[in-house]
Swiss-Prot record:
Any one Gene Ontology BP term: ADP-L-glycero-beta-D-manno-heptose biosynthetic process
Name of this protein: Bifunctional protein HldE
Lineage: Bacteria, Pseudomonadati, Pseudomonadota, Gammaproteobacteria, Oceanospirillales
Protein's gene: hldE
Species, as recorded: Marinomonas sp. (strain MWYL1)
Function: Catalyzes the ADP transfer from ATP to D-glycero-beta-D-manno-heptose 1-phosphate, yielding ADP-D-glycero-beta-D-manno-heptose.
Catalytic reaction equation(s): D-glycero-beta-D-manno-heptose 7-phosphate + ATP = D-glycero-beta-D-manno-heptose 1,7-bisphosphate + ADP + H(+); D-glycero-beta-D-manno-heptose 1-phosphate + ATP + H(+) = ADP-D-glycero-beta-D-manno-heptose + diphosphate
Amino acid sequence: MNSSYLNFKDKHILVVGDVMLDRYWHGGTSRISPEAPVQVVKVSSIEDRPGGAANVALGLAKLGVSVTLVGVVGNDENADVLARCLEDAGVICRFVRSETLPTITKLRVMSRHQQLIRLDFEEREDSLSQNEALAKVVEECLPKSDAVIFSDYAKGCLADVQSLIKLSNAAKVPSFVDPKGNDFSIYQGATLVKPNLLEFETIVGKCSSTKELEEKAKALREQFGWKALLVTRGEDGLILLSDDKPPFSLATAAKEVFDVTGAGDTVVAVLTAVYVTSKRFIDAVEYANQAAGYVVGKLGTASISAERLDAIMFQRSHNTNFGVLSPKDLLEQIKLAQMNGEKIVFTNGCFDILHPGHIAYMKQAKALGDRLIVAVNTDASVKRLKGEKRPINNLIHRMSVLEGVGSIDWVTWFDEDTPKEIIEFLTPDVLVKGGDYTIETIVGADHVLAHGGEVKVLTFVDGYSTTSIIEKANL
């Protein structure tokens, strides 16, 4: 699938499953308690995050998908905290409130980026009335849903998931399952089931080879009538079995792994969102793999925007050491170029509508060194700087046009309002800005100069500006 700016905003996905509140107490430790041989943590901050199925819903919302979340919570303050976290992100919460169960809460005490202890507040109660109440809400939500995700953490919400899958099938809504436990028959009839390797081998037994895994996966898919089965294998990548097609394998997209927290939630969220857009399992798996590779390279539970995901896929489709590269991949190429004695020039901007003034400016900038980098503001960054009607052209279109300019070697992107972070990350040899700047007012100039680089101010060609073009065209 060629990279395209995926528009998830007209899609609605229903998430059903075990919702949790992840709570973090952060503080310093400097002494041992006189009461027991344990550290004393002086709590300085408290952080609340959606967890479990709620994290899946949050990930979808950050992709730009319209999301409804259904789950069981207690009639307590933590349920209200969780709902506020989610609703602030645009998630519609349809919680079933229990008078006898608490909201599942996992409290982690953290100090110096290390977890000292985790306290779990949870109880399980499989009741007919709870299952019926849940089914009623799901049935109400299905008609407006493009897909449903069942996020099972074996905490009791999906005790009767088979009935919910039957409801989704009756409504002709595809269902995607992130499973748990040692009985996958409860997921019979689902569209796609996504176990990790450990969960898969719990069902089928240890697999001594990829061939054996594929054979067992094929048999399991056929046994339970799934259209597709996706086995995630960590550093060994993913394997997809769908319909009567040959197994489809992908190597992991992760280059560095800092934290796998929430990676499975990211996979099922992106997988489902892309599938409802493309209707192709392979496309969905390719995007999900890249998204997982991105989030495991971040500390803590991370998510990914549609814009960043599309930029990553755009770069991947070009598969070259020049052109559009992520900041991390670009840094590798810069180091190689500098080892070869090449001087790296950097400039940045929105470049919403490329005009002759831009082209002349790029030629001047390139003449100051051997390689020219152009860093582009993402769409969200442009909106913050220029207003809600901008950009006229989305990030992928802007980078694609810049990539075709002969004087430009590399194109990358940044999310922030200023290029300070990306300049400090890449540390070019020459920093260039156009217009009425002075060196003292150029963002990142101090960093480049401190590292022995140069800062240059170029004059723009008179008579050209993006704003005047937009005004003339009444855009």
